[in-house]
Amino acid sequence: MVLITVLANLLILQLSYAQKSSKLVFGGDECNINEHRSLVVLFNSSGFLCAGTLINKEWVLTAAHCDSENFQMQLGVHSKKVPNKDEETRDPKEKFICPNRKKNDEKDKDIMLIRLNRPVSNSEHIALLSLPSSPPSVGSVCRIMGWGTISPTKEIYPDVPHCADINILDHAVCRAAYSGWLATSTTLCAGILEGGKDSCHGDSGGPLICNGQFQGIVSLGRHPCGHPDEPGVYTKVFDYTDWIQSIIAGNTDAACPP
């Protein structure tokens, strides 16, 4: 009970401590309590860090720029004020980041695989999310979710995660929005061209879900969020599935795509 209370307080303070590159869901609605069972909270003694996604009973996938010292993970969370009976807390046993990632570039290979110190089991509010069998096509409708701000300019955080539908866009849209950024095949460009819906501060590391499959990881975006023609950039999970599966199988020297 003490741990649950501490987590609730940390989540309430998430805005004050969220890193600048974090993102949150703007323009969405309250998620159904059972549609985000794979969503994971990463936090430490200072507060909320990022989101993550449960892909295996022992493994969570998040963004590499979410890496921090001494963090924990909470699973099965919906309301920050009313804990679910099946919420679980885990520590990281091992963390894996692409060995060829550019250390001075948070946008490069923004993916991290975390092994839990103990497995978790499916429950009413905890479930795995499937890795993709194929990449999403331009125009696909996908779901984003998180406890991030629900305002593009003000720090207004909901008590429960919000969800929104956005579209996979052509890389040219993101190249135009982020001058100096070279879109790569290992990223996805996703959002709403007319604006109004977006991931934003606080949602970093969370999932982009298309047709029930885990297609993207929240990585990069504009602030304020939700501006027209300024979509978000997501790590393309499909291109890392071989690396992910190799690590889980025990090949810790596996290489990421270039």
From Swiss-Prot:
Keywords: Disulfide bond, Fibrinolytic toxin, Glycoprotein, Hemostasis impairing toxin, Hydrolase, Hypotensive agent, Plasminogen activation, Protease, Secreted, Serine protease, Signal, Toxin. Expressed by the venom gland. One of its GO terms (cellular component) is extracellular region. The keyword Glycoprotein applies. GO terms for molecular function: serine-type endopeptidase activity; toxin activity. InterPro entries: Peptidase_S1_PA, Peptidase_S1_PA_chymotrypsin, Peptidase_S1A, Trypsin_dom, TRYPSIN_HIS, TRYPSIN_SER. The active site is at 65 (charge relay system), 110 (charge relay system), 204 (charge relay system). Coiled coil: none annotated. Gene3D superfamilies: Trypsin-like serine proteases. The keyword Transcription does not apply. Residues 25-249 form the Peptidase S1 domain. Residues 1-18 form the signal peptide. Inhibited by the serine protease inhibitors NPGB, PMSF, p-aminobenzamidine and aprotinin. Not inhibited by soybean trypsin inhibitor or EDTA. Disulfide bonds join 50-66, 142-210, 174-189, 200-225. It is found in: Secreted. Glycans are attached at residue 44. N-glycosylated. PubMed:17034951 shows that it contains approximately 10% carbohydrates, PubMed:10871053 shows that it contains approximately 20% carbohydrates. Residues 19-24 form a propeptide. Its EC number is 3.4.21.-. It comes from the Eukaryota. Snake venom serine protease that activates plasminogen. Weakly hydrolyzes the alpha chain of human fibrinogen without releasing fibrinopeptide A. Does not hydrolyze plasma kallikrein or factor Xa. Does not clot fibrinogen. Does not affect platelet function. Induces hypotensive effects on rats. Shows a preferential cleavage at Lys-|-Xaa over Arg-|-Xaa bonds. Monomer. This is Venom plasminogen activator LV-PA. It comes from Lachesis muta muta. The lineage of its organism: Eukaryota, Metazoa, Chordata, Craniata, Vertebrata.
